[in-house]
Amino acid sequence: MISATSFVTAIGSRPPRYRTPSPPRRAVEPISPCSTADYRTYRASREISASATSDHVRSTPTDKRPSPADVPASHRSGHGRSSSTIDTLATIALATSPTFTPLTHRPPSDKSNTTLSMFPPETEPVERPAKRPRSERDESSYTQHRSNAFSIARPPAISDSMKTDAELLLNFARPTNLYPPIPSSKRANTDDSYHNHTFHTQAQIKERNASTYWVTNHENVIFNHSAMHNIPPSRMRSQSDGSAAISRPVIEGLRPNTSSSTLPPLAFQEEADSGDRHWDMERKPVLEESQVDFCKPDETVPILSQSQPLKKELDADSNGSSQASCATCNLVRIPVDNEDQDVTWISCDGCKRWFHIVCAGFKNDRETRTVDKFICKTCRPIHGQTTFVRKSSRVRTSIDYAGLNQGLVKSATDSLEHHYIEPIKQNKIRFLPENFPRMRPELVTAEYFEKGNGMTEPIVIPAEFNTHATIPPTNPEFDALVQDAPSQEMFDELLDHLPNVDHETVIDCGQNQLDMVIPQGLTVRTVSELYGPEERVEVIDVKSQHGEDKRWTMQKWADYYESTGDKVVRNVISLEVSQSKLGRLIRRPKIVRDLDLQDAVWPEELKAVGNFPKVQFYCLMSVADCYTDFHIDFGGSSVYYHILKGKKTFFFIPPKDKHLKKYEEWCNSPAQDYTFLGDQTKECYRVDLSEGDTMLIPSGWIHAVWTPENSLVIGGNFLTRLNYGMQIKIAKIEKETKVPMKFRYPFFQKIQWYAVLKYLEEDPVPQSVLAAFSQDENYRFHRKYPIYYEFGERANTEPKGSPYHNSRFYSQAELEGLPDLAKYLLRTALIAGSYLVEGVTADTRNAVKRSIPAMPGEPIDVIRTFGVWIAWKRGNEKAAHWTRPGVVESNAKLSLAEKRPAGRPSRRSERNADNQRTYAERQAVQRLSERPAVDIQKDSAPGDESVAPLANNSPPAATSGIPVPVMNEDTSQKHKTASRGSGLGPKRVACDACRKRRIRCHHKEENNGASGSQMTVSTSSLGHHTPTAQDAASALNSLAAIASGAGFQNGLHSIKGMDRMDASANFATSISATPHGVTLKVGDGSPDGLNSAKKGRSKACDDCRKSKRRCIHDEYGRIDPIKAQERSKPRATSLAKRPRVHEEAAPSSANKRLKQESTSPVAQPVHSSHMDTETPTRAQDSVENGVLDQYPRKSNTQHADGLPAEKALLPDQSSYASPPAFQADAVATKELPATVSKPAAVLVSPPTSLADEMDIHDQVDAGGEHVSVIYTPSSGSRQSSRQPRQVERYMPEVHFAKTAKSTTTTPQTTRRSSFGSSGRKTTPGLSSGSKKSGSRPSSSHGKKSLSPSVEKKAERHAISSAPFGQHGRGSKSEHGTSDVDPDAESLRLIREIQEQEFGLRRRAGRA
């Protein structure tokens, strides 16, 4: 172990240009203890050497160091060094040093009872400990002591410097990971008040001069402070984990070594194998000049028991140290367990000494970052105070972006108080001087405000005026005059002039001059007991201005209020106590009771049962520095405020229109929390209240409140007749700023209605006045002067019943606010009366209805009478326009359907509605199918008219030939979107397709135009008058017309008196005669008219969406005839889905889309093998009457004989998604087979069938097999909503059927048909069979049969794929059931359809 002199920096002692090698940071590790083997021997020798030289060192400080021969040599045990060059050089360098003798590691002697101090002096530095051996680890080595004494002031030799360098080399060469880090709980700072390796006596140490010390475990080595003057200046702050204090000495002027922050610290460790190795370190005092005091031996602390409490005590000692320099402080806290406990050093720019930041007076490292030049206490008289870096005085805030994203802006400071408190305290916020009146309590009466200008500004009743003393019955001065009357005449005269003061004698219950009763000595604890200790109270966090997540109990709040010390500032401002024991002990001021509108108009029977707004008594409990930001009391109510304890400071902003606008903008601003509203309005007044003061705050005044000290306040809110206009204005602001309902005045609207009823009840309008106003809209009731002048000499004395009678005095402020009250209640009456009012939801309408009390008559009639009452009382003015008879009734009213409440109904209501709708639709369909043909003809005949034939190839222009019923205006002119399924958000404006593509939607406008101007629905022929039955019947009639082929048979002129038409006339008539047909514009060749353009889909209702079918219901669950007429939307490509072979019998798979097909039923091909084309009217009759076999025989004969040439369907033109095209190819009709028989496919599923879900197309693959393809709404569909739809047209000439080979010569791209009706064309007089395209499916492979059963039996394979020559044969062979009796089939199909539609259905899957 080297002596302490090796660390002394001697100026000029080193060779010229000699540079001490600096080990890299993190490479220097603490010196390890030597082995235990020969520690005892070595310590004994050191003690002998020290005892022999101690006196000499003390007396001759300049003597030479002991020679190497004086130091007993011992070998290095346990240093298993590697053969590195650095180790070799270091060993050689150490060998040249006479004092750097290898230390033997010996355990402590049992006879040694000297202890080392655990708490070293503050001014003593520390010495570097011995180097730790590589191979051994012995905790007892930390107590080793040096035996060599040395002179403090003598300059060291060159060998000392070289020895230091060698030690550095050794430290550099030593590994840094020999031992794991030792917990800080075992770290100890020990005394090092000795400079040699012996335990010195107190007398020896007293005579020594203390200088700079270094900590090596618990030993200090003295350094010469005077030798530091030539060291280069260096003022750096560095992090140290304590190992720096072990690795390098604290030499004045040099930077402390902080490179070993990751090395294990020196600490006293327990030995598991020995229990007697507890080293009691003697507590040694600070060496100040030459005096050191030792602690008693019995005051030792075992090193093994030292832990965290010891460190805390050391920290406290260091914090409380009066020493200015850590060069003399050995309370070195060197935590190294983690970086959070690192100790920061700072250097003095004056003396260049290093200090721990705590010793320098800094709390943490963050404070040192602002230091420019640090000056220790010793240097301050010479160098001045510590300087800091320049910091801007501008206020900066750190934004909590997470909170800001949620709309909550929090204060960035660490202060517990609100961020406005400090500026207010420092008067940084300027306020205008206030001159609000201070009034005596006897002057504050209702009469004062009613007969004046009302209560327009805050009023303060000082505590010195509002006492509890009784008022004497007479004036003391008058009593003195009476007693001093010299004569009887004078006495009588005084009695005659006795002041007529009417004093009310009341029971003394502790009331003050305002007649307000509040228990004296009320405290927060008492409030807690009276209200209920376990009752909940809402607590406000002042800093965030938001309520706590959970309500506190009154017990918890009382404990918080009475607690002292730093705490989060919280406030209670919404504790209403009227229904508690405390509420029965309080009485409001008389002025408040007289002006309270609620007390005047609320029914007594409701008050008796406790059903009234409870806002009369609020107990406000605030700790110091509470702050409530600017607000207006709910409903524009007025406030009374009495300070029981503490102080309050108000900041008032008058309720001018510009200020209210600023207030509304401020409330909606995201920077509300950090924007002082007073700075925005430029008009803000400050009012300070003390204990006992009472304040009245008028309606609408914007105010904030600061609590300078703990306070207890009793207050309350009340509405008045004097502030109708302001109260209603504030209520509207609350609505605009979206104030939650729980923070609004309860039953505000109901109180206003009760006020109106009170006016009309106590002072009814005479009949003569009502008649005069009703007869003449310009009538004015003449008054000589306003009625608010009628007091005193002008008091009203007219008898009751007179037009000029007043039941009471009406103030000017009250009369001026009545028009605002009438307008406000008129709107509520219109809403309750189901009139159209903008921006009113169903929930709002229901709430308004509940807010209107029971009254004689309708609310609209009552408010109309009140309008006349206002004109009568105000006088000399006309009544409002809306009071005229019939004006209100002329406004639009909601329809019966629109009166239904919005929002998603409950599951139970949904089920009930679905069951009722399903039952009604079933009944309607069953009645329609069972009605005899005669009845239907009787019902429909009176309304039918012949339709004039149109010109050839010209589209129909009107539908005047069909009786048009009177439809709901909303249904015909306004698009009705389906319910979104939830009550959240506005209704969708765009269709789903455009909304998903995020483009502007024009489909709703087109749909509106089409439905409003061109769509006419014929329901008069149904014979049923119930809405559900009519809807169901209408849908069935339309679909029945589609099922019939949607064309006209040539020669069926006997039906309903219709003459035989040519092809174009039949086409036009087929559209016009369709019950739900759609008229087309002139020049529009598409049968769909406007519907041929791309359109999005409205969202289906819940029932249809769950059952996965196209929805034709409106938003109220009824069948929408317009939706029933719309064409279905394309779903998927022809290869999307293929039904399984065994599922071909699934009846509903063919009828999946009816939206567009029912709109234009004529644009549908009909297969000659199944049915003959006939008019939709005829088909409808045949469906309704069940007579399906009357006309097909006639048509078959016509087909056999041949018909005029007409346009036939080509294979590529069956898709409704294709534009209309005319085909010129002719087909010989003589080749048509004569086996075409009855129109079996004449029945369709109801509008809610599966026909609106999938499109089934029969296709022929390469092998000739027929494959049914199911189309679903897939985005991969070729004919998507983004592409124009193409629909076939009809030409007057007839396509003659050719051979199968000829049909293959017209290859066309396969196009899908969305529905059986959409891909089918009608040829008058011709039963056009389907043509087969050899290797490609025909374009008429759509769902050609509107009856699923018939389609699967007759069309799916045979008709659509067989050529004309093989048509009948293929139909016979594959579907022999096509000749089933149509009557039985129709009845069976209806039942089957209903089972599919309203029961559980099985969808066709993939093949």
Curated annotation (Swiss-Prot):
Domain JmjC residue range list: 577-735
What superkingdom does the record give? Eukaryota
Q: Name the segments for region: Disordered.
A: 1-86, 98-151, 893-987, 1004-1027, 1122-1183, 1252-1389
Does the entry feature the keyword Aminoacyl-tRNA synthetase, yes or no? no
Catalytic activity reported: N(6),N(6)-dimethyl-L-lysyl(36)-[histone H3] + 2 2-oxoglutarate + 2 O2 = L-lysyl(36)-[histone H3] + 2 formaldehyde + 2 succinate + 2 CO2
Which keywords does this chain's UniProt record carry? Answer: Chromatin regulator, Dioxygenase, Iron, Metal-binding, Nucleus, Oxidoreductase, Transcription, Transcription regulation, Zinc, Zinc-finger
Biological processes per GO annotation = chromatin remodeling; regulation of transcription by RNA polymerase II
EC no. given is 1.14.11.27
Cofactor: binding details: Binds 1 Fe(2+) ion per subunit.
Where in or outside the cell? Answer: Nucleus
Copy the domain comment: The JmjC domain mediates the demethylation activity.
The role this protein plays is:
Histone demethylase that specifically demethylates 'Lys-36' of histone H3, thereby playing a central role in histone code.
- Name under which the protein is recorded: JmjC domain-containing histone demethylation protein 1
Originating gene? jhd1
